[in-house]
C-alpha cells in the first residue's frame, strides 16, 4: 500500500492571512514529496474559507514547479461546476506543465452551499448525473473530433486543446460511496476514492465491499485501484493523541455545520460555534474521533493501516485538514513519514530528506 497527502488551505477565523495559509500548504506538500509519498491531492471548493480551493489545477501547476517526484491529483474537481471542453483542456494543460504527473479525481460535490451559488436549483442527484455524463465526454475530447449530445451539454465536433501528455489520458478517479457510484467507476475504467468521514472501520469495510462487488460484476474489465482517505494524526504520546481527538471534534462540528448549510456566513466564514454547541453533537465527540479516525502513536497507526492494506486498499491518503496549527500538522506528517511509512514495503521512503527545510 502506498501513501499520499490530502491537503487544502483551511480557515475557521481571520487570524491567519490567506497568503500564510498557502505558504504553509506548499511546505507540507514539499515535506510529502521529499519524504517519499506517492501523491498529493487537493480539491475544489468555492466561496468557503473553511476549504479554500477555487481551482486545483492552479495549485497543481504551482506544485509541479515546487516538487520533484510526487504525482499531483485533483481531490476532487466538482463535475457540475465545469463544462467538458474546459475541464478537458485545463486538465491536459496541467498534465503537460507537470510533465505527466497529473491524476484527476472527479466528484459530484457535497455542499448545498456551493450548489446554490454555482448551479442554482441543482440537487445531489442531478450533480451525480452530470458526473456520469462528464467522464465519457472528457475521455472522448482527449481522443479528438468528438461531438456530444447529452442531457446537460451539447457541442459539435471538438478536440481538446491541448491533449494530455499521458496517453490515452491521465488516470481518472471517481469519488464513490454507494454501490451505484462504485459500479459506474469500474465500468468506465476509473479508479475509486472513498472516505468514511467520521465513521469507523465498519464503514471502511463496507466501502471496500461495494468496490469488490463492482469488480465482480464487471469481471471483463481490469480491476482499477482504490484509495482510502482518512483524517490521520500520528502522535508522540497518548496525551498528544487525545489533544488531536479534541481538535478533530471541533473540525467535524464545523464540517457538519457547513454541510447542513443553516448557519450565517460572513466574509466566507461561518458563524462561530459555541462550546455548548460543539459539546452537544452526538456523533463528533472526542471519544468517537479517537476511536474512529486514525489517531495514535506510530505503532497504533501502523496496525490500523496494515488492516486496511489487508482489505485490499491500494493507497492510503493522509487527510491533514483538521483545524490544527501548522506546527502540529507538520509534526504529525513527519512522524508519518519517518515512523509509519517504513513499515510498508511499497512506500519507498527516503527518510533522510523528510524534515529538511524547503529548498525548491
From Swiss-Prot:
One of its GO terms (cellular component) is cytosol. The keyword Oxidoreductase applies. It comes from the Bacteria. Its EC number is 1.14.14.-. Pfam families: Bac_luciferase. The keyword Flavoprotein applies. Keywords: FAD, Flavoprotein, FMN, Monooxygenase, Oxidoreductase. One of its GO terms (molecular function) is oxidoreductase activity, acting on paired donors, with incorporation or reduction of molecular oxygen, reduced flavin or flavoprotein as one donor, and incorporation of one atom of oxygen. SUPFAM superfamilies: Bacterial luciferase-like (SSF51679). InterPro entries: Bact_Lucif_Oxidored, Luciferase-like_dom, Luciferase-like_sf. It catalyses: N-methylnicotinate + FMNH2 + O2 = (Z)-2-((N-methylformamido)methylene)-5-hydroxybutanolactone + FMN + H(+); N-methylnicotinate + FADH2 + O2 = (Z)-2-((N-methylformamido)methylene)-5-hydroxybutanolactone + FAD + H(+). PANTHER family: BLR5498 PROTEIN, LUCIFERASE-LIKE MONOOXYGENASE. Involved in the degradation of the pyridine ring of trigonelline (TG; N-methylnicotinate) into succinate and methylamine as carbon and nitrogen sources, respectively. Catalyzes the insertion of two oxygens, followed by a ring cleavage of trigonelline to yield (Z)-2-((N-methylformamido)methylene)-5-hydroxybutyrolactone (MFMB). It is able to use reduced FMN or FAD. Homodimer. The trigonelline monooxygenase is composed of a reductase component TgnA and an oxygenase component TgnB. Belongs to the bacterial luciferase oxidoreductase family. This is Flavin-dependent trigonelline monooxygenase, oxygenase component. It comes from Acinetobacter baylyi (strain ATCC 33305 / BD413 / ADP1).
Amino acid at each position: 500500500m502506498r501513501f499520499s497527502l490530502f491537503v487544502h488551505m483551511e480557515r475557521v477565523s481571520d487570524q491567519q492571512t490567506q497568503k500564510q495559509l498557502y505558504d504553509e500548504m506548499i511546505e507540507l506538500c514539499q515535506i510529502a514529496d521529499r519524504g517519499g509519498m506517492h501523491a498529493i491531492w487537493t480539491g475544489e471548493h468555492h466561496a468557503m474559507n473553511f476549504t479554500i480551493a477555487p481551482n486545483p489545477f492552479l495549485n497543481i501547476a504551482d506544485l509541479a514547479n515546487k516538487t520533484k517526484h510526487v504525482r499531483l491529483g485533483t481531490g476532487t474537481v466538482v463535475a457540475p461546476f465545469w463544462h467538458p471542453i474546459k475541464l478537458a483542456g485545463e486538465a491536459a494543460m496541467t498534465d503537460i506543465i507537470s510533465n505527466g504527473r497529473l491524476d484527476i479525481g472527479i466528484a459530484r460535490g457535497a455542499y448545498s452551499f456551493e450548489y446554490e451559488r454555482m448551479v442554482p436549483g441543482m440537487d445531489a442527484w442531478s450533480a451525480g448525473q452530470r458526473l456520469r455524463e462528464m467522464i465519457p465526454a472528457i475521455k472522448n475530447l482527449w481522443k479528438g473530433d468528438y461531438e456530444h449530445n447529452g442531457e446537460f451539454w451539447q457541442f459539435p465536433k471538438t478536440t481538446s486543446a491541448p491533449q494530455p501528455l499521458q496517453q490515452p489520458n491521465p488516470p481518472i478517479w471517481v469519488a464513490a460511496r454507494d454501490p451505484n457510484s462504485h459500479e459506474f467507476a469500474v465500468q468506465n475504467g476509473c479508479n475509486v476514492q472513498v472516505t468514511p468521514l467520521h465513521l469507523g472501520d465498519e464503514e471502511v469495510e463496507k466501502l471496500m465491499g461495494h468496490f469488490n462487488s463492482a469488480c465482480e460484476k464487471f469481471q471483463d474489465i481490469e480491476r482499477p485501484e482504490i484509495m482510502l482517505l482518512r483524517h490521520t494524526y500520528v502522535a508522540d504520546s497518548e496525551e498528544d493523541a487525545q489533544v488531536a481527538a479534541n481538535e478533530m471534534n471541533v473540525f467535524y462540528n464545523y464540517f457538519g455545520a457547513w454541510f447542513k448549510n443553516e448557519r450565517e456566513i460572513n466574509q466566507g466564514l461561518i458563524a462561530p460555534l459555541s462550546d455548548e454547541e460543539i459539546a452537544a453533537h452526538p456523533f463528533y465527540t472526542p471519544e468517537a474521533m479517537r476511536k474512529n479516525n486514525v489517531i495514535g502513536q506510530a505503532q497504533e497507526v501502523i496496525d490500523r493501516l496494515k488492516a486496511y492494506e489487508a482489505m485490499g486498499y491500494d493507497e492510503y491518503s493522509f487527510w491533514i485538514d483538521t483545524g490544527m496549527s501548522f506546527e502540529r500538522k507538520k509534526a504529525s506528517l513527519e512522524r508519518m513519514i519517518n515512523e509509519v511509512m517504513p513499515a510498508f514495503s511499497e512506500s519507498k521512503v527516503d527518510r533522510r530528506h523528510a524534515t529538511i527545510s524547503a529548498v525548491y
